[in-house]
Amino acid sequence: MRARAIGRAFGALLLCCGLLAGCAKQPEQERQPPGRVDAAQHDAFFLWAGVKAPEVLAKARTIYLLDGEVRAGSPARFVPLRPAVPHVRHAEIWLVVRLERLDWKEPVWRRVLADLDRWQAAGNRLAGLQLDFDARTRGLDRYAAFLAEARRRLPRRYKLSITGLMDWSAGGDPAALAALGSVVDDVVLQTYQGRRTVPGYEAYLRSLARLPFPYRLGLVEGGAWRAPPALARDPHFRGYVVFLLPR
């Protein structure tokens, strides 16, 4: 009996040690670095002008192509960055204009609309126009007014897309967000700055449910990323777009 009691006690001790060891390892597992964005696992991409098209684009379903910029310098004018009209047959494409100002003059509007028509006439499956602008959260009402003007000028055959900031969901005025969402068809919220994922992006993701419109998340190729479980359950979440980096 005594031997059995000693055996049971020794077994209990081993079990306790095993549990303690498991508990000790858990924080180490939680500290593991997040995953990295693998472009090969996605089918929607940003391709900036001057970036050589990688092989991953062969399986793309959606491609956002930078056409030009409207820069902050005076006067406001369109600066073309793509030397030729693209010819893409296997994927839907968006014509992207990067803008640093909202006071567009008539020549700018005419040039952008003419480029849209040229891209469509070349046989592309052109979804529409994407405006890439870092609108500050406190200025969303002004941006919404600009987007309403863009929607008014765009022929109905073209959709309107915008990029946005994750901070919109945390601090954006509800009325301004609703006005913005009423005129756009596609929103891509950027989770990166430059070539890196924004530090602490997880905190922003927790407030995405406040957004009153569907959205996608823009990820930078090779950047840190770990999707929270709640994201897949958000009815407004429409997937990812990967920003491809120069090779």
Kindly give the residue locations of the regions a language model identified.
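Sec-dependent bacterial lipoprotein signal peptides
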Residues: 1-21
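Secreted glycan hydrolases and related glycan-binding modules that recognize and/or cleave
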Residues: 11, 22-247
